[in-house]
Design a protein with these regions (language model features):
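Bacterial N-terminal signal peptides that target proteins for export
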Residues: 2-16
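Cleavable N-terminal signal peptides
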Residues: 16-17, 27
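Sec/Tat signal peptide C-region and signal peptidase I cleavage site
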Residues: 23-29
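Central antiparallel beta-sheet cores of small beta-barrel/beta-sandwich binding domains
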Residues: 32-100
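Short, exposed beta-strand-loop hairpins at the edges of beta-sheets
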Residues: 102-123
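Short, solvent-exposed mixed-charge patches
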Residues: 129-130
Length: 130
């Protein structure tokens, strides 16, 4: 005959086993919101929520000649496409061209922003500063 103590221990053991089995399937979601630095130009871009989508705009530039770009929205509304990933239009503020953009979180302080035209893609890893 099983006592209450044994039944409780068995229940706790079963719950712990289920948790350990499910652990690898739990995705670690990183937050893209905040200010990020583009390493190649020193440009700072704020990623923010815009109606449940991911938007981004230029908030600071290193090169004074690019000061007119401050406030330019470069990502007007990307949608989540997978865990830690968003896809949407991406504006190149320098030439005005629109690309397919993919934001992939690589950790809490690193994201990769990739722009694609047809099958040609180029990406860069940005660092979170705020």
């Amino acid at each position: 005959m099983m006592t209450n103590r044994h039944s409780s221990l068995l229940t706790k053991s079963a719950a712990l086993t289920l948790f350990v089995i499910a652990l690898p399937g739990i995705a670690c979601a990183f937050d893209p919101y905040g200010t990020w630095m583009r390493p190649s130009t020193g440009t700072q871009v704020s990623f923010y929520d815009c109606g449940g989508k991911l938007c981004a705009k230029i908030v600071a530039v290193k090169d004074e000649r690019r000061k007119s770009k401050i406030g330019t929205v470069i990502m007007p509304g990307a949608t989540r496409s997978a865990d830690n990933q968003w896809k949407g239009d991406l504006l190149n503020a320098d030439d005005g061209k629109i690309y397919t953009g993919v934001v992939t979180m690589q950790g809490p302080n690193a994201l990769n922003l990739t722009g694609c035209v047809a099958f040609i893609c180029q990406g860069e890893t940005w660092t979170k500063i705020k």
